[in-house]
Amino acid sequence: LLASGQPLWIYDSPISHKKGMLNPHLMKVYDELFDKAEKAVANDKVLLERVQLSRLPLQYSQLEIARTEAGSDKQKSRELLELFEQRTAQFGVKSLNERNNPPAEYCVLYRKRFLPQNEKSLAAGAKVEWISKPEAKYQTIADEALTDELYGGTTYVESWVGWEGRDAEFILDLGEEKSFSRIETDFLHQLGAWVLLPKSVTYFVSS
């Protein structure tokens, strides 16, 4: 954590640290250490369960980071989610964070939002033209976040784009005429961070 230079906040997310203490190399190291630990106590049920319980935060971090990575191995995520669901139930884990989100609800939501669905977005990869640019803290991901087919998470640092005290206005250029039946937009409501739902939304289409 200290070497990464990334501060750790009280309501933080693993996603904030995926280039720091939770980068791919270190995550691989952590995983290997837990593999060795489980192997070392494989014949002792009590100790094995302690290691498996201690591993849950790492598995949660793996799931959270995987859903923000385009092209990630969805089958691997599905298998890890099933194991995470099984273990949290086995060990009676009641909540995952300060917001008291139950593991069972998290797993249901993860399958619905972050694992492959039959429908594909016609706006995937579309060019974004900003009429009103997002706040500076969102701009590093803004050009991709709206059209990368990845849903945002439960906190504003997890793949969301935001504006403060003004309306959001932008154009999605699909590059060519396309036929579609509906327009959908996803929003975050996080009162603790003063992130609020819009009062209204208006869409315009052109041909």
Language model features with spans:
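Catalytic domains of carbohydrate-active enzymes that cleave complex glycans
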Residues: 1-125
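Short, surface-exposed beta-strand/strand-loop-strand elements in extracellular ectodomains
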Residues: 194-206
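Disordered, acidic Ser/Thr/Pro-rich linker "stalks" and the adjacent N-terminal cap
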Residues: 112-180, 188-197
